[in-house]
């Protein structure tokens, strides 16, 4: 059977026709509509999926935010604008006529990455460091989503009580400091106004401030991993996202994690499926128990 997998992010929408062996047969991308309105998103999704839906038997969605009863929510509702409570599952079922499943994108990515690990790994955590920081937890071979879809939102654990205010309303969340947005917000002087990609480029060129910003992000993520190990006793942590997969970033996380006590050490690896993990994880979930 073929699954129409959809990844809904803050900057782009992706869709792919995925076989049961997780091979992507066809793929399309569009920018996420700048106008955060239900009509704009519905129209963009219609344009995105129309060429792919004719050969699919089901739809699987990996989306930013919290998915609750098929609708789109968020820890920070302002991020969604007019899309708060957008009926994601009913909309795709109406557009395609196919049974539809929806899950948080980091939870979906965790499920894909879990299946890429050795068979003796039953407990793992996926952390994505990108525009924000998210995560997914697999415990004893089962993906944890929680009663309300909140499970795995690791970016909203506390890193620094005196740190910057996070979009969720707390002060000093991991996301507010270690994410691409957090890195950019902390840049000053000649780097003020730079995005995270530019900060990383300056760090590679030896700019001292940029090096410190990237190091601080990696240190905060390493401390998060130590906390995750203490909380879940996971066997493996997988890192993804545009920041997490940036050149040299994982090595820095390893460096800072090695400074934590031995009990908090855990195997680290980069995401096997790279930026397709969300799409493929949603497709896997739609296939049922694996």
Swiss-Prot record:
Annotated positions binding ATP: 5-12, 132-139
Biological process according to GO: N-acetylneuraminate catabolic process
Name of the top EC class for this enzyme: transferase
Gene3D superfamilies: 3.30.420.40
Chain sites annotated for binding Zn(2+): 156, 166, 168, 173
Keywords assigned: ATP-binding, Carbohydrate metabolism, Kinase, Metal-binding, Nucleotide-binding, Transferase, Zinc
EC number, as in UniProt: 2.7.1.60
Pfam family, one: ROK
Involved pathway(s): Amino-sugar metabolism; N-acetylneuraminate degradation; D-fructose 6-phosphate from N-acetylneuraminate: step 2/5
Superkingdom of the organism of origin: Bacteria
Single annotated GO MF: N-acylmannosamine kinase activity
Catalytic activity field: an N-acyl-D-mannosamine + ATP = an N-acyl-D-mannosamine 6-phosphate + ADP + H(+)
Family annotation (PROSITE patterns): ROK
Matches recorded under SUPFAM superfamilies: Actin-like ATPase domain
InterPro entries found in the cross-reference section: ATPase_NBD (IPR043129), ManNAc_kinase_bac (IPR023945), ROK (IPR000600), ROK_cs (IPR049874)
Family: Belongs to the ROK (NagC/XylR) family. NanK subfamily.
Its job: Catalyzes the phosphorylation of N-acetylmannosamine (ManNAc) to ManNAc-6-P.
Self-association and partners: Homodimer.
Name of this protein: N-acetylmannosamine kinase
Organism, scientific name: Citrobacter koseri (strain ATCC BAA-895 / CDC 4225-83 / SGSC4696)
Gene: nanK
